[in-house]
UniProtKB/Swiss-Prot annotation:
Gene3D superfamilies: Anticodon-binding domain (3.40.50.800), Bira Bifunctional Protein, Domain 2 (3.30.930.10). InterPro entries: aa-tRNA-synt_IIb, aa-tRNA-synth_II, aa-tRNA-synth_II/BPL/LPL, Anticodon-bd, Anticodon-bd_dom_sf, Pro-tRNA-ligase_IIa, Pro-tRNA-synth_IIa_bac-type, Pro-tRNA-Synthase_IIa_type1. It comes from the Bacteria. This is Proline--tRNA ligase. Keywords: Aminoacyl-tRNA synthetase, ATP-binding, Cytoplasm, Ligase, Nucleotide-binding, Protein biosynthesis. It is an enzyme of class 6 (ligase). Homodimer.
Length: 582
């Protein structure tokens, strides 16, 4: 490719709406353009990188026997209603109606569609297992799209689905996808971590996420260096001991005036007690009714864990105005005493350790002190429903180490669905004994457009993007520093022609602009290797420079073949993550 023919509208200025480095550099580098909030066009450079990512994904899918299909974007509402996800998925489901007033959604994921498709195809145990995938555009009505292509309304995703007659077969496929996903990240050339994950709105019994490590990653990851335990913040457990202090005597519960103190900090300060003595009461609401979650005052509730424990993905934090209307009290004074019986109370394990605690009194300006769980108020269920903290004990039995925290960007997630969808949609097969049984399923998602943003987020510097060679828009850039010098131009052309013939993805910057301008653009778009042909050509020397290194190397230029061999060797050893610290 000649830069003079390339449509790559690079920008010097940072976009005014930039909220993350990857968005800034993809815009400035001419890879993408914003159409509206969360909706982007991919320009030639951006689409070229996307296609290279897709190719790696396709090859790894084919290695494990997954066959490519294409499913519809528009999904009939009745299929989502069959599984209950029409309501449970929440407002992120982008719904629409046709001219006949029939309801549809733009697919964020395809479990219902693929299950409906296969229920009419797979009838006998002899037809299993089946492994299918697609790469397609998906839609999610994000409440606040942000971080560029990392959290968009419209995005490109690879989703795969496997169908089995038993769980042993499912486990085998799950491991195949686990290995394939690791291969994808390794082939792209990124630092990553695999973590235990919450199944969320997809559902199922078991899941792992694949995170690209990045300082500005949107996801928190907790891990143990000693035993290798790792989990997303939504799933992470700890080995903290929440035993009761047996030396402290139980006291009589008493209502006290706490005036205008509402928050945990205000109440603790007013009563001159530790936040660990307070029991935070949080009201949640779903289509199934009200839930009160209790947690120790110094911890934060983990909504994903509550949803998982109660098997209710529609649970959300209740609106304070709805709480006031329903219970006649502001959220700062709610508590489990005198709460109606139809409100389910779930308590974090940390509440077990609180003796003579402080809770809201369900009336304005009042709290109870010396309150004790199960003696003074009911609890329907104890469970782990909090976010862990860095420095807590590792949950692995016998490890005795502590958890550390880092940040990452989720690019892939795999799920063991079991019969979650097949049982609800009556997708059954006849087994060897003539009995009908529901399909056992797995699903496996990979965010193609998210990977684009994640790469840039991990690999960049003050000059621009540092693409790994596997997905770089070009592997090599040839830069003739003076287009009016015949020797420089002819040598550059000779090198360009040879590299093209040898199959190198190469660009020559043949624009009539200054050398400095060329260097800035080539660095901005992140080409791994630069071949700089300048005035030293008269001495038989040219410069090679790697994108991830500050200094270049002057080499003797004898012939194009020898230069090609040197560049090829540099490309083979090129690893911009080598000195990366995250």
């Amino acid at each position: 490719m000649r830069f003079s023919k390339l449509y790559a509208p690079t920008l010097k200025e940072t976009p005014s709406d930039s909220d993350i480095k990857s968005y800034e550099l993809l815009i400035r580098g001419g890879f993408i353009r914003k159409i509206s909030s969360g909706v982007y066009s991919y320009l030639p450079l951006g689409w070229k990188v996307i296609r290279k990512i897709e190719q790696i994904v396709r090859e790894e899918m084919e290695k494990i026997g997954s066959q490519e299909i294409m499913l519809p974007i528009i999904h009939p509402a009745e299929l989502w209603k069959m599984t209950g996800r029409w309501e449970d998925y929440g407002p992120e489901l982008m719904k629409l109606k046709d001219r006949h007033d029939r309801e549809f959604t733009l697919g964020p994921t395809h479990e219902e569609i693929v299950t409906f498709l296969m229920k009419n195809e797979l009838r006998s145990y002899k037809q299993f297992p089946v492994n299918l995938f697609q790469i397609a555009t998906k839609f999610r009505d994000e409440i606040r799209p942000r971080f560029g292509v990392l959290r968009a309304r419209e995005f490109i995703m690879k989703d795969a689905y496997t169908f089995h007659t038993d769980y042993n077969s499912l486990h085998e496929s799950y491991q195949h996808f686990y290995n394939a996903y690791e291969n994808i990240i390794k082939r792209i050339g990124l630092k990553y971590v695999v973590v235990e994950a919450d199944t969320g709105a997809i559902g199922g019994s078991f899941s792992h996420e694949f995170h690209v490590l990045a300082q500005n990653g949107e996801g928190e990851i907790f891990y143990c260096e000693k035993c290798g335990y790792a989990a997303s913040d939504e799933k992470a457990r700890s080995g903290e001991d929440f035993s009761v202090d047996e030396n402290e005597a139980f006291k009589e519960m008493e209502k006290v005036d706490t005036q205008h103190a509402k928050t945990i900090e205000e109440v603790a300060k007013f009563l001159n007690v530790s936040e660990k003595k307070l029991i935070k009461s949080i009201l949640l609401r779903s289509s199934k009714g009200w839930v009160m979650a209790l947690i120790r005052g110094d911890y934060e509730i983990n909504l994903a864990k509550v949803r998982s424990v109660l098997q209710d993905q529609s649970l959300e934090l209740a609106d304070p105005q709805d709480v006031l209307k329903e219970f006649g009290v502001n959220v700062g004074f709610i508590g489990p005493i005198n709460i109606p019986e139809n409100v389910k109370i779930i308590a974090d394990l940390s509440v077990k350790s609180i003796k003579n605690g402080v809770i809201g009194a369900m009336e304005e300006k009042a709290h109870y002190i010396n309150a004790n769980a199960e003696r003074d108020f009911r609890i329907n269920l104890f469970a782990d429903i909090r976010y862990v903290k860095e420095g807590e004990k590792c949950p692995t039995q016998g490890c005795n180490s502590t958890l550390k925290r880092t940040r990452g960007i989720e690019v892939g997630q795999i799920f063991e669905l079991g019969d979650k969808y097949s049982s609800k949609m009556n997708a059954v097969f006849t087994d060897e004994n003539g009995e009908q049984k529901p399909y056992i399923m797995g699903c496996y998602g990979w965010g193609v457009s998210r990977t684009l943003g994640a790469i840039v987020e991990q690999l960049n510097d003050e000059n621009g993007i540092i693409w790994p060679k596997s997905v770089a828009p070009f592997e090599v850039a040839i830069i003739p520093v003076a287009m009016n010098d015949e020797a420089i131009v002819s040598t550059s052309q000779e090198i360009y022609d040879y590299f093209l013939k040898e199959g190198i993805d190469v660009i020559i910057d043949d624009r009539e602009v200054s050398a400095g301008f060329k260097f800035k653009d080539i660095d901005l778009i992140g080409v791994p290797i630069k071949i700089i042909i300048g005035k030293r050509l008269k001495e038989g020397k040219i410069e090679l420079k790697q994108r991830d290194k500050e200094e270049g190397t002057l080499i003797e230029f004898k012939n194009v073949k020898e230069l090609y061999d040197k560049v090829k060797e540099k490309l083979e050893n090129y690893d911009p993550t080598q000195n990366l610290t995250i």
